[in-house]
Amino acid sequence: MTKKLLIKTWGCQMNEYDSSKMADLLGAANGYELTEEPTEADVLLLNTCSIREKAQEKVFHQLGRWKNLKDKKPDLVIGVGGCVATQEGDHIRQRAPYVDVIFGPQTLHRLPEMIRQSQSNEKPVMDISFPEIEKFDNLPEPKAEGATAFVSIMEGCSKYCTYCVVPYTRGEEVSRPLDDVLFEIAQLAEQGVREVNLLGQNVNAYRGPMHDGDICTFAELLRMVASIDGIDRLRFTTSHPLEFGDDIIAVYEDTPELVSFLHLPVQSGSDRILTMMKRPHTAIEYKSIIRKLRKARPDIQISSDFIVGFPGETAKDFQDTMKLIKDVDFDMSFSFIFSARPGTPAADYPCDIPEQEKKDRLAELQQQVNSQAMRYSRLMLDTEQRVLVEGPSKKNLMELRARTENNRVVNFEGSADLIGQFVDVKITDVFANSLRGELVRTEKDMGLRVVMTPAEMMEKTRREDDLGVGTFTP
């Protein structure tokens, strides 16, 4: 009888990626099939996130519901992974002794063995260590699920922003070897993937070891991924202003596969608050990056992260943030009220901002960004947009759902054989959360690009004179 696996995922795209790898791993090693029904499952896995407030209590509430299932089905295996597991492993073991397996983001590759150990020893197994990049060497070959795919290129963060738990839960920055990243993407491309999103807590800090002992920069990686046959659209998330150098900006000038949309977190427009956050940039330095980007790619649209109500944030600090939002003209944002994370320096900062004031600031910020986003959407009316068809529309199964470069969903009438392909559509209507379009042309009429090899892309990126001095020639 086939064993069933349920994975519940909270948090960022890195967690979504990790959960997909857990499913691949347990499917390949033990023949588990995914289910969405907890009552059918033989293994229940919770992949957790510790970014938001009350993350731990949310975990224990979910585990309490699963405990009822385990009481009725004693052989049921319950596992907790992700950042809360790393941060609160011992506490989980004490408060929820019925949990069989506790693992961190860096040890998910050991999951099959940990499950077997818990079953044979009939006692909980925990491994929340940081074995750096080892997990990627022990995962099965990637399996494509549609025309888009996420690929993790690095783990961890070494910036230690005062509000953030990532360095403590995922470790410091470790880059995957270049060949491993390219091979995974090439495998996905062979399975029909057309768009790749490179993942990491700080992707532009990527420094991937190469087979010749050299180091590949993020800019070089972008060009090489863009050269892989079949990959026609390239995204990345999340990046950091500190390492968003001119070499990365130059990629926007000569690599059309890289989309005209960038998520670049700034968190605040107040230099005083940025200093308290240990963000090593000013608002002006951030705007300087955006100016260079728009010179390289005039139509690029920018999204960002914002924290309001950070301890000590005054009305002026908040207005500085609002000014930055208007000056940069952000298209989208992920914005939150500050939530103290245990173990971070900011958790000890005194805060006397009334809760209602925090909520009012958040509402004002979101209203401003939403109005800017709607204006951008209206500018797309009656224009042609190249979109990647992802599948049936979620609102009308007789229509198709596609995505623009600037991350907007477009619904349009078309046949199912267009799924996984690029098409051009004319935007005919604009809504708050989506667009409507009409099919103009299909992929066979496009002539998307001339294929270049990775070696040709590297030659384009790296040239050295007789003294060994490198120059970039676009």
Swiss-Prot record:
Family: Belongs to the methylthiotransferase family. MiaB subfamily.
Residues annotated as domain MTTase N-terminal: 3-120
Gene assigned in the entry: miaB
Source organism phylogeny: Bacteria, Pseudomonadati, Pseudomonadota, Gammaproteobacteria, Vibrionales
Keywords: 4Fe-4S, Cytoplasm, Iron, Iron-sulfur, Metal-binding, S-adenosyl-L-methionine, Transferase, tRNA processing
Documented EC number(s): 2.8.4.3
PANTHER family: CDK5 REGULATORY SUBUNIT-ASSOCIATED PROTEIN 1 (PTHR43020), MITOCHONDRIAL TRNA METHYLTHIOTRANSFERASE CDK5RAP1 (PTHR43020:SF2)
Pfam families, per the entry: Radical_SAM (PF04055), TRAM (PF01938), UPF0004 (PF00919)
Protein name, UniProt field: tRNA-2-methylthio-N(6)-dimethylallyladenosine synthase
Residues noted as binding [4Fe-4S] cluster 1 in the record, renumbered to the chain: C12, C49, C83
Enzyme class: transferase
Domain TRAM: 378-441
Cofactor(s) recorded in Swiss-Prot or TrEMBL: [4Fe-4S] cluster
InterPro entries referenced in this protein's UniProt entry, alphabetically: Elp3/MiaA/NifB-like_rSAM, Methylthiotransferase, Methylthiotransferase_CS, Methylthiotransferase_N, Methylthiotransferase_N_sf, MiaB_methiolase, rSAM, rSAM_horseshoe
This protein's record includes keyword Ion transport: no
Residues noted as binding [4Fe-4S] cluster 2 in the record, renumbered to the chain: C157, C161, C164
GO molecular function (one): metal ion binding
Localisation per UniProt entry: Cytoplasm
GO CC annotation terms, alphabetical: cytosol
Catalysed reactions, as listed in the record: N(6)-dimethylallyladenosine(37) in tRNA + (sulfur carrier)-SH + AH2 + 2 S-adenosyl-L-methionine = 2-methylsulfanyl-N(6)-dimethylallyladenosine(37) in tRNA + (sulfur carrier)-H + 5'-deoxyadenosine + L-methionine + A + S-adenosyl-L-homocysteine + 2 H(+)
Function: Catalyzes the methylthiolation of N6-(dimethylallyl)adenosine (i(6)A), leading to the formation of 2-methylthio-N6-(dimethylallyl)adenosine (ms(2)i(6)A) at position 37 in tRNAs that read codons beginning with uridine.
Signal peptide stretch: none
Details of cofactor binding: Binds 2 [4Fe-4S] clusters. One cluster is coordinated with 3 cysteines and an exchangeable S-adenosyl-L-methionine.
Subunit-structure text: Monomer.
